Regions:
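Glycine-rich phosphate-binding loops of nucleotide-dependent enzymes
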Residues: 1-146
Length: 146
């Protein structure tokens, strides 16, 4: 953008870089966004934002509607962005995705945000208890098997 005007050449370069990096499948050479499938549009939007190397990124359901390979690419890109010093807030209902991406996990329940816990300190069961409204959740001791 120069003087408030989008420079077509620069936008085209960014688009092609994102299309290649995130394997966006386009039906024709220069498709409009509305011509992309939901999954391809998701890949393009996530890729475009990641290409900007933002200092802060908030994403909601980042891998919704994409295939497993694209989901892995998106997750790794979010991890790389975080490791590069950016703050990345991921909102997702996919616990596997959260455990793979997050350093810390918090849960919203009944309009309240729980404390953020190190991801390694949480289990799916503990997250379920937080979702049910528990504020302090202690891991139950494991029973010895006879």
């Amino acid at each position: 953008v120069k003087s408030g005007v989008v420079q077509r050449g620069g936008a085209s370069n960014i688009s092609e870089r994102v299309i290649t990096s995130f394997d966006v499948r386009k039906g024709k050479p220069d498709p409009e966004a509305r011509a992309l499938s939901g999954g391809n549009l998701q890949k393009f939007v996530i890729g475009r934002e990641l290409d900007r190397n933002p200092g802060i990124l908030v994403v909601n359901q980042p891998t919704w509607g994409v295939d497993a390979g694209a989901a892995a690419t998106i997750r790794q890109a979010l991890i790389d962005l975080s490791r590069g010093g950016s703050a990345v807030l991921v909102i997702s209902q996919d616990l596997d995705e959260i455990f793979e991406i997050a350093d810390r996990i918090a849960v919203i329940s009944r309009g309240q945000l729980s404390d953020a816990y190190p991801a390694g300190d949480l289990s799916a069961e503990r997250i379920g208890l937080l979702m049910a409204g528990a504020h302090e959740v202690k891991e139950a001791p494991h029973a010895a098997h006879a």
